[in-house]
Swiss-Prot record, chains A, B, C, D:
This is Chorismate synthase. It comes from Polynucleobacter asymbioticus (strain DSM 18221 / CIP 109841 / QLW-P1DMWA-1) (Polynucleobacter necessarius subsp. asymbioticus). It is an enzyme of class 4 (lyase). FMN binds at R125, S126, S127, N238, A239, G278, K293, P294, T295, S296, S297, R319. The gene is aroC. GO terms for cellular component: cytosol. InterPro entries: Chorismate_synth, Chorismate_synth_AroC_sf, Chorismate_synthase_CS. Reduced FMN (FMNH(2)). NCBIfam families: aroC (TIGR00033), PRK05382.1 (NF003793). It comes from the Bacteria. Its cofactor is FMNH2. SUPFAM superfamilies: Chorismate synthase, AroC (SSF103263). GO terms for molecular function: chorismate synthase activity; FMN binding. Belongs to the chorismate synthase family.
Length: 371, 371, 371, 371
């Protein structure tokens, strides 16, 4: 199937461009009988939407979702769920210049040579705006996983540019525009962003995502390991340059005697695995981290060439996100939810329905989740 | 399609277990008319095979591949290519004990609860032995990519446990059992491995993979970005816990003014992107890094439980790899080749045949590849 | 991928229900650079739309399509093409009764037991209205195939109930509401339909579809033969109960000496194969026939049961098609076009781009097409 | 996925050529825990194998299957099941001549122009020999369906050339080499075949296939209707030119008042639908018919051309099947079983596990199956 569909059984097919009339998704394979309304979806969309603080793009989009199909009298019918979000704040008058140039770090160059030309309006299909339908689709997955397994998702910023953001408490995440699980570091982050904006520059971010109450047994050997499909989904988010599961790159310098998570009758003693063993969920908390590169659209002039290969200087004007990572947390959660949902269905196809298989030992040990 | 098939158009479906009668793969979608013989495949298999140095598993396997189909008078016909490798050194007499226990860090626990029971002989399906058919299949992809685009692959060890392995020269890679691109560090690596083995412990590794002469335009928005499919393939390799493209996690603390690779009439000035822009190959060298966790089978006793949840102590006896990362380089190359091959076919399906589209500017600038 | 997507590379994912707010499709994998506007699509939609004669459903739908994405400055960009058709004539007030009963021959019974309940409004997802997005999507495929290979499609009614409709001339097809390639039989067909309507009954139809200038080489052994994928697509149309390629069921009683189409330097002498050999297009005219069952919604009372299994009598009131086959011709053409388009892309993925491979002998011989 | 894989969740990937070293299949997605041995598979293979009567090809093949993987201690593990059948009776010495010519009705012409050349040995990939791995794979599906739902399959010859073969009793099918459910017609069929062989000609056949105890609810709207996937699978069998479900082409001339199967508290009153409603199984007996064309390899000379387009005469020498339809019954059963198995898993993925959902009314009424 083509590149705009995610998943094998719970599939999300998106369409739309940044400055076209609308964006949206078709969600197929949703189990029937689940209550669903626009309100269930809107909450997550609102967490992602632009313009919520001065640190992100000032584009004004309500991101109001319309369910076009797949729901009857408030319940999913098993038919595909059409989701539509109209674009309202397109400003595409003056892209003519952009069409002739390649902005360093942007998709321009690759799109141009792949397709022969490109839609330059706000990045077209390569815009981060296209994560909105993904977040909308994932809200459906989250609801089902919550109802069936009690699965819960949360994400938070682990690092903003050079500043590490220590995890204090989950409750802080919703209290600030950075999705920081930390109540004291916000002024420092705000100062950092203001300085960046003044310098006409941008920075990257590290986002952490977690899922708890994940059923044991999700993921398929060999190629479609749960972590492999998570890596695929995460690396599919705009600007992501790295993905880690559990100890990630730290495991390179760990000894085996340290890395392997001991098992005790009351659960795993640690979580270096990040919740997967042999590519299959172990019931422990799933732990994923992603690296997001600094925004390419900056006010600082950069060397580039035009489509004829002639040297030019490129400098972004107008609104932009100095750190796309700030709004990435709900997107990363969404991707994780979509992968789990797809694998929950794949698992019950092959192995039958299970309501969170509970082994003689609990999957997690008190206090083992945050080592 | 189920989890044992990789790719959409150039598909590799593997089968087999560590200690079953045979392992193998069916490679479908190969373009017709390419000369192919067992010899083309055997070379890569030999680079991966066990028992080549004292630092890896001492299992004796010839890994001799037989082509069962898809080739007529030395040429691929377009029909699926069946590849068969007989297992010869199975020692599965005494697995009874293993069946009752979960080895920390192993797939045992997850397989047991997913499938209800498991094949314990040498790890069954979760054994790293199953990378052999992948390497065999990828040899076909490499050959085609080389003939069509001049694409070349190489990988090397970037770090062994705590020891960084500086890149000196590609030519050294084949001169030592570590795939180190460095001629001086070998004694240090050997000493480190000997010490680990004495300590009954294991370590992780960081592997770097590169592809040059990659056509511009490979990769599909949105979900099947080239880097997304690379991440999927790499995370599907046993023991991989992290994947990076280009600057990877370093991009978190980079400024946009630094990260974005400038373009000049003679090529890109740097390669922080790792060869993809917007998920599409830019023609620059592809750069991927993976983190491999330390081997779970160690001589050091670990706490665990048996399948009834009772506490036990687990200690591996007999042959094992103290660092599975040592043999991972050809496997990582193989995965990269399979992803590129699949996307080369996907690209020409949608956009027509191209023989390495050459833009007015060359994709790489003299000296820009190793910054 | 789930059941609402057709195709591997040129994929059509539809959504919507008969009486929901909208129906539509996402068309992914379209080659870039083709001029496309709503007008290109509307023509085929208009041929399919209801209410065009007194012999079909009187539902009033404009079936006006909106392109939501994938086109920039009048050209396809390679991004997914979102197509939206708003429903305007929904009359869903009084379905309460239908929800409790199973109409004989309808999907009610199967949907109810598959999903646990169903959307009863106008048949919900099982309505023939859902062929509109398919026709819209196929208009894109037809345009591309025409431009690249000169491929042309036409279909016609071969039989209406008990009345065979002899083929006279292609030009007549557009001159009557039955898609009959015959100018003299129309009064007889009209009389037959009027009589049926008076009797409160319905009838089936046999539709013939043809494609000419089909490139040689489309179709993939083993399972995805061109004819296999055509059969899949055709049998996916509502009410279709049979599919034939070429001589079809007549080939059962043919001798091999008669059935096998002789080859001469000026082309094939006959076309019993229907344009495929070994599941691959031979360049001859593609010939497909489908059987459409009589409409299940009839004014004649039928025995049935309610959802509790109690006996009831079911009798349709209000508007309905006495022969859904009358409007099926453009739908069958659409399905054929989608399959050819998908296989055209699949072929050039594996075998490279070909502009209608021309063998030393022409694929068709003068006069051989209509034997 | 490429064309040599059937199914979405229960996937069968075949490889091999008629005269290569081996043929085989990888069966992926099989539920774990089912007992399975070669003996379970061999029985169906033996029903299909050549050389069992004087009316079929005299090629001597034992068709002995080896299970290479996916089974541990006699039970399926959930890992892919590798199946291998060595070819033993290849006679490929003198194909040189065939390579230069196109045999009318054969795949030669299409393969040649698709791939640029072809494997001529016994038809290569296009040989009916490749149905052996399909039959082997389907034996696994049949076993699982039988154990879970009590599903049973049988097929029989409905017509041989011009001779209709009336259905008398299922028990006769295994008593004659024609799979005729009729004990009296056998001498007539044998005489017909002897005459054909003397005439150097061949004939077609009509095969009927049935499945009973099919769970309600299998099949997916819109495109992957159960009947659509059945049509795809059946048309994928060599030499099949037509597929019917239930009343098939007879439904064209049926009135709606006759065609629609009445429902009564004790079941359906008839079975014109053939066991599907809206593309979803209704629990009634599944009824499929296929048309098989006469064998193309005949002793009668036919006009053709060589690969340079020059006129030639083609005449088959040596062993051949004068009616490939004679051995097609177990193949058609196999295809039906594979489709049902795949949809059984797809259904429980989306809708949860069901052990043959039993509605308040039974799916079939006493005596309704053979109307």
């Amino acid at each position: 199937m083509s590149g705009n569909t995610l998943g094998l059984l719970f599939t999300v097919t998106t369409f739309g461009e940044s400055h076209g009339p609308a964006i949206g998704a078709v969600v197929d394979g949703c189990p029937p009988g689940m209550t669903l309304s626009e309100a269930d979806i809107q909450a997550d969309l609102d967490r992602r939407k632009p313009g919520t603080s001065r640190h992100v793009t000032q584009r004004k989009e309500e991101d109001k979702v319309e369910i076009l199909s797949g729901v009857f009298e408030g319940k999913t019918t098993g038919a595909p769920i059409g989701l539509l979000i109209r674009n309202t704040d397109q400003r595409s008058q003056d892209y003519g210049d952009i069409l002739q140039t390649f902005r360093p770090g942007h998709a321009d160059y690759a799109y141009h040579y792949k397709y022969g030309f490109r839609d330059p309006r706000g990045g077209g299909r390569s815009s981060a705006r296209l994560t909105a339908p993904v977040v909308a689709a994932a809200a459906i997955a989250k609801k089902w996983l919550k109802e069936h397994y009690g699965t819960e998702f949360y994400g938070y910023m682990g690092q903003l540019g050079e500043i590490e953001v220590p995890f204090q408490d989950k409750k802080h995440i919703a209290e600030n525009p950075f999705f920081a699980a930390n109540s004291e570091i916000i002024p420092q982050l705000e100062g950092y962003m203001d300085e960046l904006r003044k310098a006409g520059d941008s920075c990257g971010a590290r986002i952490e995502v977690r899922a708890s109450n994940v059923p044991i047994g999700l993921g398929e050997p060999l190629f479609d390991k749960l972590d492999a499909d998570i890596a695929h989904a995460m690396m599919g988010i705009n600007a992501v340059k790295g993905v880690e599961i559990g100890a990630g790159f730290k495991s390179v310098s760990q000894r085996g005697s340290v890395h392997g998570d001991d098992l005790h009758p009351d659960g795993f003693a640690s979580n270096n695995s990040g919740g997967t063993l042999g590519g299959i969920s172990s019931g422990q908390e799933l732990r994923v981290a992603i690296a997001i590169k600094p925004t390419s659209s900056i006010m600082t002039p950069k060397h580039s060439v035009d489509i004829k290969g002639q040297p030019i200087t490129v400098q972004t004007k107008g609104r932009h996100d100095p750190c796309v990572g700030i709004r990435a947390t709900p997107i990363a959660e969404a991707m994780l939810a979509l992968v789990l949902m797809d694998h929950a269905l794949r698992h019950r196809a092959q192995c039958g329905d299970v309501e969170l298989a509970v082994p003689p030992i609990p999957a997690s040990r008190p206090g083992s989740q945050l080592d």
